[in-house]
């Protein structure tokens, strides 16, 4: 969020999550990532039980169709785990992080984007979900 236009190297620290309560930026980012990971893996927020999920459906489709990408579901989880590890290394205050060590913040952003690519291209392809330009918002 606080990166502004990454490709133009414009940084907007006032766009970080929890700008007015800066010491929880990292906590919110980690919780958001955990929520996406839990949804992907079919984990309940209420009692921690697991059920059917995008992961189990990917595994089913891959095995049913003898697809070569047998490790896709694990690759996606690996991206989630790597992103979380990268986030844990950041300052709790993303404004301070960006101003103090932008490069580390950008590496974390890149790690998260690798997961987005796995979800929005590889997973959708395996699940035979077509996305048109209106749905592809440029994440």
Question: Model segments located where?
Answer:
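Generic detector of bulky aromatic hydrophobic side chains
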Residues: 1, 17-20, 40, 126, ...
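C-terminal catalytic subdomain
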Residues: 12-30
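An amphipathic alpha-helical core segment
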Residues: 33-102
């Amino acid at each position: 969020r606080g990166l502004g236009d990454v490709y133009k190297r414009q940084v907007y620290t006032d766009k970080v999550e929890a700008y007015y309560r800066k010491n929880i930026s990292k906590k919110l980012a980690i919780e958001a990532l955990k929520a996406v990971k839990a949804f992907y893996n079919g984990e309940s927020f209420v009692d921690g039980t697991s059920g059917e999920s995008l992961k189990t459906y990917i595994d089913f489709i891959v095995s049913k169709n003898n697809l070569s990408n047998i490790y896709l579901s694990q690759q996606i989880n690996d991206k989630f785990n790597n992103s979380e590890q990268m986030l844990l290394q950041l300052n709790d205050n993303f404004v301070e992080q960006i101003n103090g060590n932008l490069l580390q913040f950008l590496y974390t952003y890149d790690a998260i984007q690798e997961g987005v690519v796995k979800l929005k291209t590889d997973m959708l392809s395996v699940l035979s979900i077509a996305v048109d330009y209106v749905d592809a918002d440029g994440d």
